[in-house]
Amino acid sequence: MTSDERELRAWHRRLCPVTDWLTISGDLQNDEEGALTQIREWQSAGITDVVDLRQEWSDEDVIYHHAPAIHYHYLGTHDNGGAQSDAWFDAGIAVLHEARAAGDPRLLVHCHMGINRGPSMAYAMLLEDGWDVVEALEVLRQARPIAAIAYARDALRAHYRRHGLDPAGFAADLERQRAWFSDNHIDVAKVIRLIRQPASA
């Protein structure tokens, strides 16, 4: 594994602050010692809420026992490349509003690798916060270079439906989205392969 490949792999569980209230990352390590080290990093970073988007796993018990002050929100979903529902995005937006109503939150939004589901939900939250369609993509990719944001189209669709916005505006914003992805392609298959590869390889 080259130094560049090791750097790509290292993004998996790295905390990636996007704004002062939003951070994205991958999931906790499987071994207890590694997971506790990460949780301490989350606490040091001021994380108040964790939004876990993995259908395949839950860390609710781990967070409850080792970081009870952190609010854990489980919104597990698939990562099969198909569409994500409006209801799933709406649930994430409800968490955002709930956290803000409770004080001054710092949300950690994550899935397994922090490539698609987590960044896509974070994108939905940025749109809800008033960010421009393309500027939100830019800030996510700058914060986390392995963020592919595969469900961005679904996030945009859910945003327009949630707020009853003009369908013509959706078409225009969707085209801006497509143009950005065309100009900012990343090799997702390579990133996934490197993350799955043993560290000693």
Residue ranges and their predicted role:
Residues I115-S120:
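Glycine-rich nucleophile elbow surrounding the catalytic serine of serine-hydrolase chemistry
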Residues E7-R106, A124-H159, L165-P167:
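Cysteine-based protein phosphatase catalytic domain of the PTP/DSP
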Residues M1-R6, C16-P17, T23, A171-A201:
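Intrinsically disordered, low-complexity regulatory segments
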Residues C111:
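Short cysteine clusters
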